[in-house]
Swiss-Prot record:
Superkingdom of this protein's organism: Bacteria
InterPro entries: GHMP_kinase_C_dom, GHMP_kinase_C_sf, GHMP_kinase_N_dom, IspE, Ribosomal_Su5_D2-typ_SF, Ribsml_uS5_D2-typ_fold_subgr
Gene3D superfamilies in the record: 3.30.230.10, GHMP kinase, C-terminal domain (3.30.70.890)
Designated name of the protein: 4-diphosphocytidyl-2-C-methyl-D-erythritol kinase
Reaction equations catalysed: 4-CDP-2-C-methyl-D-erythritol + ATP = 4-CDP-2-C-methyl-D-erythritol 2-phosphate + ADP + H(+)
Function statement: Catalyzes the phosphorylation of the position 2 hydroxy group of 4-diphosphocytidyl-2C-methyl-D-erythritol.
Pathway connected to this protein: Isoprenoid biosynthesis; isopentenyl diphosphate biosynthesis via DXP pathway; isopentenyl diphosphate from 1-deoxy-D-xylulose 5-phosphate: step 3/6
Alphabetized GO MF terms: 4-(cytidine 5'-diphospho)-2-C-methyl-D-erythritol kinase activity; ATP binding
Binding site for ATP: P108, V109, G110, A111, G112, L113, G114, G115, G116, S117, S118
Encoding gene (name): ispE
EC number: 2.7.1.148
């Protein structure tokens, strides 16, 4: 380490953050908007599968990113980089400093789990902590909106939310703590844009059965409430969806569903089945899907 690097290490401020995945406990596509996006109604729940981030304020201006996944872009194509740039552009406290982001990817990419959006939202929250909470939660959510539909949820402190608009208008909900979830990912990247374009071809008026928040006193009916409008379309493109659902059902899941635009499927298990049963099911599924099986809980 040369002298300049040594001086930088002494003045840099670091923060470790965990960026959680999410599952969609319901997702209904309501209509297509004039801007090409779709209005949604979705119940999002953060779960205990995390990307790991380290944020470092540096003397050198700009944003740099290193990542454990060599397939992840390191420039402004990455939402985490764009989030950092958005924060720096708004901040009056950062001065001429820049940001270095170290990202360890554990959440599968293109999986319907919100990994990239979570990284971006977590960068906003982390930089805000490093800079002594310069912005309110509401201001962070507003900053997150141009970055992507799910980013406001991850920029918030909400563990669960009912989201409308394009997914950026949030109503906080209590976490679904009485269930365990097993996530299974087939290792197939699904383009959210492509799925919504295909869905628009089949969009027809429908009753908004699922377009409402799921309330605490209704938890007994959660399993009936689960629904994903996009699942049928993704299943046609990715037959593994139905296969994963069948395996989860055969191994005791109370309900199974695809998360977001796929390709991850999750099974819901009553907490009362116990960790031993969860571990057994994960072992069975891992024989086919390897390291893409995750036992998680609501956070």
């Amino acid at each position: 380490m040369d002298r300049n690097e040594g001086e930088l290490a002494q003045v840099a401020t670091r923060l470790h953050m965990r960026a959680p995945a999410k599952v969609n406990l319901s997702l209904q596509v309501l209509s297509r908007r004039a801007d090409g996006y779709h209005d949604l109604a979705t119940h999002m729940q953060k779960v205990s599968l995390y990307d790991e981030l380290e944020l470092c304020l540096t003397k050198q201006s700009g944003v740099s990113l290193v990542c454990s996944d060599g397939d992840i872009p390191l420039d402004e194509k990455n939402l985490a980089v764009r989030a950092a740039l958005a924060y720096l552009a708004r901040s009056s406290r950062v001065g001429q400093r820049g940001v270095r982001i170290s990202l360890e990817k554990n959440i599968p990419v293109g999986a319907g789990l919100g990994g990239g959006s979570s990284d971006a939202g977590t960068v906003l929250r982390g930089l805000n902590q490093l800079l002594d909470n310069e912005f309110s939660e509401e201001e962070l959510i507003e900053m997150a909106r141009p970055l992507g539909a799910d980013v406001p949820f991850f920029a918030s402190e909400m563990s669960a939310a009912f989201a409308t608009g394009i997914g950026d208008i949030l109503q906080p909900l209590e976490s679904t703590k009485e269930f365990d979830f097993i996530l299974v990912n087939p290792g197939i990247f699904i383009s959210t844009k492509e799925i919504f374009e295909r869905f628009s071809l089949t969009l027809s008026p429908k009753r908004n059965i699922f377009a409402r928040p799921f309330r605490v006193h209704e938890r007994a009916s959660l399993l009936d409430y689960m629904h994903n409008d996009l699942e049928e379309i993704v299943s046609d493109l990715c037959p593994a969806i139905d296969e994963m659902k069948s395996l989860l059902e055969a191994n005791g899941a109370s309900a199974v569903m695809m998360s977001g635009s796929g390709s991850t499927v999750f099974g819901v298990f009553q907490r009362s089945v116990g960790q031993k049963k969860i571990n057994q099911v994960c072992k069975v599924l891992s024989c086919k899907y390897g390291e893409k099986v995750f036992a998680v809980q609501a956070v």
